[in-house]
């Protein structure tokens, strides 16, 4: 391997063998080992000479391209129409290998490697070109740091003094967004436990009837007698009595619908008259949407009494207090937090808090009936009152189905205290819903981002032309060097050093012998190609 500098010249007609490229098709190795070694030495010498000639030709071609480019630039007056958007100069980012030179120069870039045959391809009888391109290998992409789309770079801020106002607007926008986010969170927390006010729900129970006096014996086509039971209600506005139940005005849309106040409604009919289906049950959990009222229609011409059972739907859940706890607090049905708060106010009003340990309070006679202890810790109140709380009893109503007289037949109306959320709750819900639909803001942001991208593009173009105007020669040299580096990266030759490969010391390294053996072992044992051919 030490006699590479004294290799004899190979005849011109012989074809060179590829060296160190596993992607090339190779000829078969003859059975004579001595012939194989001599053949390898001859081909290796030819390959080395070819690599040296190729490197020299490439260097000469590159210098020729550079000289021709400078001459044409001078002839065209240094115009850069085609290269105005090129990055890669003056810290403008990585350059593109497809950049055209100024003045629309129709000049092809010199390829660094000649074409080559893929493995297994048949050998060609034509004269092989001394220039061959290597297989393209994808280069690893560098992650480009993505700048915020709405922010301006410091380079742009230095060029445009007016950008300081835009930066101030961005800071103000961030403060507004932070404030809106905090308010949105506060509204969401408030909606979880909405404040309510007590109002009176007036429930109307009445029935109407039809075809009760038109029954003609022996006429099967006559309409049968029917009756209809209706249960409706509405929230009283400041105690004002609404109109007659048969002509109840439309409910206030700000208030919940009638069925939302009930968990379950059960109507029991006379089992003697309606043995098949005497029980009608409506459940809020199975109802797809709240209703303004309930209506039951049946056939019949006999009057009877219907039983109505209404189970209230309290949100949050309410409990009925025991007699002992009711005597202490003076309330009958209430939520657990309000019951605990009422006990706390009772203790504070009577100064029952233990002065030595404020976490305890002393029980008077009324509290001793409830808790059964003389002293109790505040944290134990919630646990102690559990057996004094029970589900509130349902509302039982009875209505007589009348089939004569006034139609509809009004029986009675009933007032029930219910919790109605503040009307502002609906406005808060609408506010949260509208806050998510910011299409106009998104459109403005998109327009701002497009303007920012255009500003950055113009800054790159300005830097490109400014660098060319200040030093045209150095600028063009840097441009050519950048494009050459990009071409090497695309061709997968970024790690090669052509200058080192020109010297014989490069092939005297320890790895060369192992590379030659690996190359020979990779060649097929037999083939159609003869020695010295592709």
Curated annotation (Swiss-Prot):
Region (Disordered): 1-33, 78-132
Keyword flag Repeat: no
SUPFAM superfamilies, alphabetized: SWIB/MDM2 domain (SSF47592)
Stretches with biased composition (Low complexity): 94-105
One Pfam family cited in the UniProt record for this chain: SWIB
InterPro entries according to UniProt: SWIB_domain, SWIB_MDM2_dom_sf, SWIB_MDM2_domain
UniProt keyword Magnesium, yes or no: no
Role, per record: Involved in transcriptional activation and repression of select genes by chromatin remodeling (alteration of DNA-nucleosome topology).
Family note: Belongs to the SMARCD family.
PANTHER family: SWI/SNF-RELATED MATRIX-ASSOCIATED ACTIN-DEPENDENT REGULATOR OF CHROMATIN SUBFAMILY D
Name of the protein described by the UniProt record: SWI/SNF complex component SNF12 homolog
Native source species: Arabidopsis thaliana
């Amino acid at each position: 391997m030490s006699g590479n500098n004294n290799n004899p010249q190979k005849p011109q007609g012989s074809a060179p063998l590829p060296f160190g490229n596993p992607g090339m098709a190779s000829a078969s190795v003859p059975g004579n080992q001595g012939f194989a070694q001599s053949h390898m030495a001859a081909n290796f010498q030819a390959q080395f000479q070819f690599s040296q000639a190729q490197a020299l030709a490439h260097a000469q071609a590159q210098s020729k391209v550079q000289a021709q480019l400078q001459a044409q630039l001078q002839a065209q007056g240094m115009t850069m129409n085609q290269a105005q958007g090129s990055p890669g100069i003056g810290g403008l980012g990585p350059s593109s290998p497809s950049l055209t030179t100024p003045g629309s120069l129709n000049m092809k870039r010199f390829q660094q490697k000649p074409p080559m045959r893929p493995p297994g391809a048949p050998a060609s009888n034509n004269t092989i070109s001394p220039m061959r391109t290597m297989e393209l290998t994808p280069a690893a992409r560098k992650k480009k740091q993505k700048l915020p789309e709405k922010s301006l770079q410091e380079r742009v801020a230095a060029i445009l003094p007016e950008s300081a106002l835009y930066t101030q607007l961005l800071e103000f926008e961030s403060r507004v967004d932070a404030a809106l986010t905090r308010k949105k969170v506060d509204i969401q927390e408030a909606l979880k436990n909405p404040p309510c006010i007590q109002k009176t729900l007036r429930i109307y129970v009445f029935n109407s009837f039809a075809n009760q006096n038109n029954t003609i014996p022996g006429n099967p086509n006559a309409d049968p007698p029917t009756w209809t039971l209706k249960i409706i209600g509405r929230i009283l506005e400041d105690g004002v009595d609404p109109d007659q139940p048969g002509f109840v005005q439309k409910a206030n849309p700000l208030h919940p619908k009638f069925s939302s106040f009930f968990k379950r409604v059960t109507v029991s009919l006379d089992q003697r008259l309606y043995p098949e289906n005497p029980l009608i049950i409506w459940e809020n959990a199975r109802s797809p949407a709240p209703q303004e009222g309930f209506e039951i229609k049946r056939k019949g011409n006999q009057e009877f009494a219907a039983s109505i059972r209404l189970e209230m739907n309290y949100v949050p859940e309410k409990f009925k207090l025991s007699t002992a706890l009711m005597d202490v607090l003076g309330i009958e049905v209430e939520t657990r937090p309000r019951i605990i708060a009422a006990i706390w106010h009772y203790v504070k009003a009577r100064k029952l808090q233990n002065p030595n340990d404020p976490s305890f309070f002393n029980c008077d006679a009324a509290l001793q009936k409830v808790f059964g202890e003389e002293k109790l810790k505040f944290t134990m109140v919630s646990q102690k009152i559990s057996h004094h709380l029970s589900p509130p009893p349902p509302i039982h109503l009875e209505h007589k189905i009348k089939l004569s007289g006034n139609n509809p037949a009004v029986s009675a109306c009933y007032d029930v205290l219910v919790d109605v959320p503040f009307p502002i709750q609906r406005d808060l819900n609408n506010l949260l819903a509208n806050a998510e639909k910011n299409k106009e803001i998104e459109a403005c942001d998109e327009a701002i981002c497009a303007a920012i991208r255009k500003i950055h593009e113009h800054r790159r173009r300005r830097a490109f032309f400014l660098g060319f105007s200040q030093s045209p020669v150095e600028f063009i040299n840097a441009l050519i060097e950048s494009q050459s580096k990009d071409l090497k990266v695309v061709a997968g030759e970024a790690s090669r050093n052509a200058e080192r490969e020109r010297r014989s010391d490069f092939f005297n390294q320890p790895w060369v012998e192992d590379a030659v053996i690996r190359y020979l072992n990779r060649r097929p044992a037999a083939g159609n190609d003869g020695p010295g051919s592709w």
